[in-house]
């Protein structure tokens, strides 16, 4: 069976590296589009952009819509970031985000340094952007007859109806 690999449009020249008859390479614009709803819908429909992509979920869901799927089921999308945040006695934001894999020491250090550079309101603003993008995706998907179901127990994402993978 064949497979479609989606890559950012900025990397389209690298698509030649994937010379395989079972692999179709398609591109998408990794550009945040914001404005009037009709404008956003037009840009999304032409694949010119998407709601602000704060993480891999936004482009993944948008890719599913662009590829014509009528039902998109989210698994492992707990987004429990809020419960991982604290501020230490030096007023540094600390976030310990558990993953199903073990972070190596370099990655843990990188994450610590990343959060220390930002005050809490900036971290929360970034999270709010992600959750706002999910609500925009839900509205766009519904207007296209696409159902997005969140099948992740305990998920903090409130934009998509809860459901089962079935």
Regions found by a protein language model. Give the residues of each.
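Metal-ion/cofactor- or nucleotide/acyl-coenzyme-handling active-site neighborhoods
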Residues: 1-166
């Amino acid at each position: 069976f064949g497979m479609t690999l989606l890559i950012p449009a900025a990397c389209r020249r690298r698509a030649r590296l994937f010379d395989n008859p079972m692999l179709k390479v398609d591109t998408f614009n990794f550009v945040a589009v914001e404005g009037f709803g009709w404008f956003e819908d037009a840009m999304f429909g032409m694949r010119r952009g998407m709601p602000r992509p704060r993480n891999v979920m936004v482009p993944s869901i948008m890719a599913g819509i662009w590829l014509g799927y009528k039902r998109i089921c989210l698994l492992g999308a707990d987004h429990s970031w809020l419960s991982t945040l604290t501020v230490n006695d030096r007023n540094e934001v600390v976030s310990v985000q558990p993953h199903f894999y073990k972070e190596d020491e370099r990655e843990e250090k990188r994450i610590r340094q990343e959060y220390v550079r930002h005050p809490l309101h900036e971290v929360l603003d970034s999270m709010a952007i992600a959750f706002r993008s999910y609500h925009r995706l839900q509205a766009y998907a519904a207007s296209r007859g696409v159902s997005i179901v969140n099948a992740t127990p305990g998920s903090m994402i409130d934009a998509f109806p809860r459901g089962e993978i079935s």
